[in-house]
Amino acid sequence: MKIITWNINRFDGVWDWYEKKKDKDTKYREKMAKAIIGYLVKLISNEDDVAVLQEFPYYEYNGSIQWGCDEYSNWTSLFEKNNLTVIEPYKKGLNVTVAVVPKQKSVWKKTDGDDCKTSFKDGYLNKYIELLKEFRILGIHLPSSSVLLPLLHRMGEADRPDLILGDFNSGDYVIKNRWDEERECERQQYRKLINVYGYTDISGGGVTNHITGSSIDHFLIKNTVLFRLNIKNVFIDDNKTLSTLSDHYPIIVELEKKF
């Protein structure tokens, strides 16, 4: 079983889509999308393989959010043509966190009546995807630890996700502006997932955002024998080719047995 987490930066490569307006370059974005899909096709082949992608574009961005312009279906159709299915969250936003699974044969499903659907504040819900097999995955894109931690508290030990993975925006930043201050806050909240809720980060602390040189993407597991004994391999794929497809590297976890 392979589980991947990767922030794909709206198929804008290494460009800062918010500042550079690279979203306008359709041909460039299609090239990036096809390269990312080609990479995922090689990894997601078994029924229990899954990739959680952050910053998957839902609405167009042209200096401001174009709420009436849904570009999501254009991108998901590219995945479908390559025998991959995109599972979307309940609530939409400019960018969403999605899961990608093998078309027609996946054992993963979006949870019914999930906690994300009912508990997260507007504006944050679109950054989560919750999946269920024999265990639960929560794919996230923070900042919104102030929402995530109370949710975990309300769930109780038995109902908390077995895996929490994604872009935590929790790197060790040098504080230069208010954005860095917010991310330092995220770092503090991230530590509570480890120290208070007992999760173990197996991502190894390597650089995942190669622009800032920070470790901001993480892969957390419940500290149980079930997972610790079945982890076969964990690595950040920092292949030079991938450094042109996004400002983030993917984290790949391989589990020894099927659940």
Question: Where in this protein do the model-derived segments appear?
Answer:
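N-terminal, active-site-proximal structural segment of metallo-dependent hydrolase catalytic domains
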Residues: 1-77, 258-259
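Active-site metal-binding loops of divalent metal-dependent hydrolases
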Residues: 6-8, 56, 142, 167-168, ...
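Active-site environment of divalent metal-dependent phosphoester hydrolases
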Residues: 10-13, 58-62, 94, 145-147, ...
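Surface-exposed cleft-lining segments at the edges of enzyme active sites
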Residues: 18-27, 114-118, 135-148, 172-178
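Soluble or luminal CAZymes and related metallo-dependent hydrolases
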Residues: 24-39, 67-71, 119-123, 143-153, ...
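Structured beta-strand-rich core segments of catalytic domains in phosphoester-bond hydrolases
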Residues: 50, 54-135, 142
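His/acidic metal-ligating clusters that form di-metal
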Residues: 133-136, 148-170
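Metal-dependent phosphoester-hydrolase catalytic domains
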Residues: 159-163, 169-259
